[in-house]
């Protein structure tokens, strides 16, 4: 849930930006966030996962059309082609298309991608999508279609490169406005509205899945454990009650937080990646990790992520004498390392306790406990 909240904030921030810009400022970002949060909460409580699934289909089709069109049209409209666009960007800023030697360097990029990949399937809403699949053929189709999403990023980059020259001066959080600002100065309002509608769905669909995953996790994995006598119906009702609560918390941090969309996404991934070590060990036949070790490692990893994020700590500030290539490594690696160390130490210390029949392993009613 701690990892999901920054991700929900990301969706609300994007929603506010899209509505405000697409309406040419007639609707404020704050009003858009509140309207979106309320609509999303009501929509989710009524329709559930099936409503989100059908909306996702419409969203995917619209966003594919918009991204493909903008990625091809923008470079040719402003520069006459892709090569002239890259030449113009290089002439204006020769180092823009390369990673810097320090800071956000190659080592930072590689380590960030690694952490993101490890955390991708740790998101609860990803598991929801997996478990709700009709049959195994759905996974085969997704394996074929999924690379298209990666290909779409190429056209997003083209739009970004175009905006670099045509919408200059966007610094910090304003960089999130680049696509819509460029669209507004290029197209008629009705086209901007279509682009905004596609963008709106890209915020609402993941937002609904995230809210559902967070509320379900709290009701089933927290309340359900604390109150074992709770029935499935009670847990289901409580999950719906958690939806507006989580939405309100997310709206608060959306309005009073200053992080950019990319920063929020990376922070969420840094937190959820802490589930990866315990998950991998759980798949092993001879699992040496105990539930105490897994929980301790996750808590230690998340605590270090929160501390690092709040204090803006980097490997360079912790170990200034290290080579630059190591200092630039994503600091989330430290949290993952702390997680692994604590996980192994606590597991070894509690191995004898966990081996007792009434704990992690053994038989209850003739069934093996995993």
Predicted feature residues:
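Membrane-embedded helix-loop-helix hairpins and adjacent transmembrane boundary segments
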Residues: 1-370
């Amino acid at each position: 849930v701690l990892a999901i909240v920054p991700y929900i904030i990301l969706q609300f921030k994007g929603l506010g930006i899209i509505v405000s810009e697409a309406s040419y400022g007639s609707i404020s970002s704050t009003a858009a966030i509140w309207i979106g949060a309320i609509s999303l909460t009501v929509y989710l409580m009524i329709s559930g996962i099936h409503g989100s699934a059908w909306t996702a289909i419409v969203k995917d089709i619209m966003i594919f059309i918009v991204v493909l069109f903008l990625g091809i049209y923008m470079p040719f409209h402003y520069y006459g082609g892709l090569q002239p666009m890259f030449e113009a960007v290089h002439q204006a800023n020769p180092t823009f298309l390369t990673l810097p030697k320090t800071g956000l360097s190659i080592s930072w990029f590689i380590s960030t991608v690694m952490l993101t990949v490890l955390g991708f399937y740790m998101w609860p809403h990803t598991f929801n999508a997996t478990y709700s699949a009709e049959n195994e053929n759905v996974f085969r189709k997704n394996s074929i279609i999924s690379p298209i999403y990666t290909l779409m990023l190429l056209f997003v980059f083209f739009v970004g490169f175009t905006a670099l020259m045509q919408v200059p001066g966007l610094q910090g959080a304003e960089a999130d406005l680049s696509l819509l600002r460029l669209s507004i100065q290029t197209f008629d309002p009705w086209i901007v509205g279509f682009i905004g509608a596609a963008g709106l769905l890209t915020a609402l669909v993941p937002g609904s899945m995230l809210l559902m995953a967070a509320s379900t996790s709290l009701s089933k994995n927290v309340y359900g454990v604390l109150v074992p006598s709770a029935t499935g119906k009670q847990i289901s009702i409580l999950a719906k009650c958690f939806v507006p609560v989580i939405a309100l918390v997310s709206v608060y941090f959306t309005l009073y937080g200053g992080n950019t969309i990319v920063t929020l996404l990376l922070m969420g991934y840094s937190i959820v990646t802490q589930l990866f070590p315990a998950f991998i060990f759980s798949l092993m036949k001879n699992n040496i990790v105990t539930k105490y070790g897994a929980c301790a490692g996750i808590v230690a990893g998340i605590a270090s992520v929160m501390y690092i994020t709040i204090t803006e700590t980097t490997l360079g500030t912790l170990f200034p004498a290290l080579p630059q290539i190591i200092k630039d490594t994503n600091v989330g690696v430290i949290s993952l390392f702390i997680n692994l160390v604590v996980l192994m130490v606590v597991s070894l210390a509690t191995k004898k306790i966990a081996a007792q029949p009434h704990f992690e392993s053994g038989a209850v009613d003739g069934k093996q406990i995993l």
